[in-house]
């Protein structure tokens, strides 16, 4: 029997940004990340780099002008066109005459000064209906929380996790100017190594750590690949394991699948003096923490995010880590005071 691929149904009720202000969306944006149900995206992801989007007043009151720059085959191309306004503020139509299709674009989330998330619906005879999400930033780099918000939006509309990518930043391109294509090794080194270590020509792009704990003091590294895989890294300053998006290849050893694995590998005894933090999320996980006032390990409810190193997964682990004395040790301590 032949199994047919599921047919994507495009959502009809895409909600635009509340109280959308058209004039505030004008100006320059950097294309930071993309996700799509279109099958070509994964095939061409290695050729994609960050471009720009310029929005402004159109030739008529019914239009807004659109100018896009991106690299194609080493040359910076410029594409100009117009979005057609609709009766819904924040929803636009874009006609692609080459393919004779009209796309619907929606501004679904934006704070105007920092980021904007667009969703675009398209129907083509070749690929059928497709849905594409794009994350734009006023600057090429955005906060990790905004990348996570974009990922959740994309997943929420049915875009597969392996079809969500960040765009490599190779600097802003100059229209018409041809640039040399970097080698794979130079791309990898630029993504992984600190600036002062580049160009040494010695060693491998990523250090070979024999012990995972040796990596705990490194900063996190996304690596040169374009995936958006949620991982944890140990932040020595906050003494907590925090999330970042891993590209899927290379990077370094400060990269953990779970918060538990990260904490059990990297935290130090100083974690025992940290406050007990439930975090802002609304999960319900019973964990152990060391209460420095009482001098003992206690149960607490962890919400599931933004905790710190003072959280343990068993009473035994907490006592062993924070040096909680047994009865004989307590007697010895009392007699020595």
Curated annotation (Swiss-Prot):
Signal peptide residue numbers: 1-4
UniProt EC number: 1.6.2.-
Superkingdom classification of source: Eukaryota
Binding site for 3-hydroxy-L-kynurenine: 38, 96, 122, 134
Similarity remark: In the N-terminal section; belongs to the calycin superfamily. Lipocalin family.
Glycosylation sites: 100, 200, 235
Keyword terms: Cell membrane, Chromophore, Cleavage on pair of basic residues, Cytoplasm, Disulfide bond, Endoplasmic reticulum, Extracellular matrix, Glycoprotein, Membrane, Mitochondrion, Mitochondrion inner membrane, Nucleus, Oxidoreductase, Protease inhibitor, Proteoglycan, Repeat, Secreted, Serine protease inhibitor, Signal
Record's GO cellular component terms: cell surface; cytosol; endoplasmic reticulum; extracellular region; mitochondrial inner membrane; nuclear membrane; plasma membrane
Inhibitory (P1) (trypsin) (site feature) positions: 282-283
Residue intervals of the BPTI/Kunitz inhibitor domain: 216-266, 272-322
Disulfide bonds: 76-173, 216-266, 225-249, 241-262, 272-322, 281-305, 297-318
Annotated site residue numbers, Inhibitory (P1) (chymotrypsin, elastase): 226-227
One Pfam assignment: Lipocalin
Stated name of the protein: Protein AMBP
Keyword tRNA-binding (UniProt): no
Tissue: Expressed by the liver and secreted in plasma.
InterPro entries: A1-microglobln, AMBP, Calycin, Kunitz_BPTI, Kunitz_BPTI_sf, Lipocalin_CS, Lipocln_cytosolic_FA-bd_dom, Prtase_inh_Kunz-CS
Site (Cleavage): 184
Mod. after translation: The precursor is proteolytically processed into separately functioning proteins.
GO molecular function: heme binding; IgA binding; oxidoreductase activity; protein homodimerization activity; serine-type endopeptidase inhibitor activity
Gene: AMBP
């Amino acid at each position: 029997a032949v199994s047919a691929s599921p047919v994507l149904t495009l959502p009809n009720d895409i909600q635009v940004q509340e109280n959308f202000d058209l004039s505030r969306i004008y100006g320059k944006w950097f294309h930071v990340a993309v996700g799509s149900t279109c099958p070509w995206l994964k095939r061409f992801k290695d050729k994609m780099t960050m471009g720009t989007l310029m929005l402004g007043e159109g030739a008529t009151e019914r239009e807004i002008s659109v100018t896009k720059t991106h690299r194609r085959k080493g040359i910076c191309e410029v594409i100009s066109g117009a979005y057609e306004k609709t009766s819904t503020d924040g929803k636009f139509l874009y006609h692609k005459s080459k393919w004779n299709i009209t796309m619907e674009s929606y501004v679904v989330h934006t704070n105007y000064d920092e980021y904007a998330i667009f969703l675009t619906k398209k129907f083509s005879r070749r690929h059928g209906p497709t849905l594409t999400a794009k994350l734009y930033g006023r600057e090429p780099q955005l906060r990790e929380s905004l990348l996570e918000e974009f990922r959740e939006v994309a997943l929420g509309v049915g875009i597969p996790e392996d079809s969500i990518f960040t765009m490599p930043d190779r600097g802003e391109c100059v229209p018409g100017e041809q640039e040399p294509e970097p080698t794979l090794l130079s791309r990898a080194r630029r993504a992984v190594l600190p600036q002062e270590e580049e160009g040494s020509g010695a060693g491998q792009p990523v250090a070979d750590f024999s012990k995972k704990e040796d990596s705990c003091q490194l900063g996190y590294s996304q690596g040169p690949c374009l995936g958006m895989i949620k991982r944890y890294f140990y932040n020595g300053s906050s003494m907590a394991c925090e999330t970042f998006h891993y590209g899927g290849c290379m990077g370094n050893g400060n990269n953990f699948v779970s918060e538990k694995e990260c904490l059990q590998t990297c935290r130090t005894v100083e974690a025992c003096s940290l406050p007990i933090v439930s975090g802002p999320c609304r999960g319900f996980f019973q964990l152990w923490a060391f209460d420095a006032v009482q001098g003992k390990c206690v149960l607490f409810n962890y919400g599931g995010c933004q905790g710190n190193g003072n959280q343990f997964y068993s009473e035994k682990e907490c006592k062993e880590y924070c040096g909680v004395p047994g009865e004989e040790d307590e007697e010895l301590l009392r007699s020595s005071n």
